[in-house]
């Protein structure tokens, strides 16, 4: 496995673990930030694994569309939209794209599940890839 890919996946794993801990402690905004970041870093690891340039974007939909051109990826357009829609409102108290956005445990669990599913897919793909020396 490419060292850069491994680093991106480790950062994604750390974000997933942080999201779970934050959810357990009722810290919903930082939980959502970490779930989104886990998905973003996982997709960037996938693109690196596929020898693609990694764009400087936080857009889950943008990254997923690029990855889906090169491999099978089980993340829906709606799931990408959800992760994209929570990014700004979970970081800043203004500029929400969701009216009256108030995060709760359910939305946090949903976002963690999406990020974790994506992480498992990419981790398995990278692990099963033939080594090139």
Please annotate each region the language model reported.
Residues 1-133:
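Terminal alpha-helical segments
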């Amino acid at each position: 496995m490419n060292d850069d890919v491994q680093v991106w996946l480790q950062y994604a794993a750390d974000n997933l673990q942080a999201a779970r801990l934050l959810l357990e402690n009722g810290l919903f905004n930082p939980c959502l930030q970490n779930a989104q970041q886990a998905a973003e870093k996982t997709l960037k690891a996938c693109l690196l694994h596929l020898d693609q340039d990694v764009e400087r974007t936080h857009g889950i939909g943008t990254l997923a569309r690029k990855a889906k051109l090169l491999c099978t990826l089980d993340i829906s357009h709606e799931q990408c939209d959800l992760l994209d829609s929570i990014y700004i409102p979970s970081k800043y108290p203004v500029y929400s794209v969701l009216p009256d956005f108030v995060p709760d445990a359910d939305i946090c669990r949903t976002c963690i599940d999406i990020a974790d599913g994506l992480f498992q897919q990419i981790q398995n793909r990278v692990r099963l890839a033939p080594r090139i020396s």
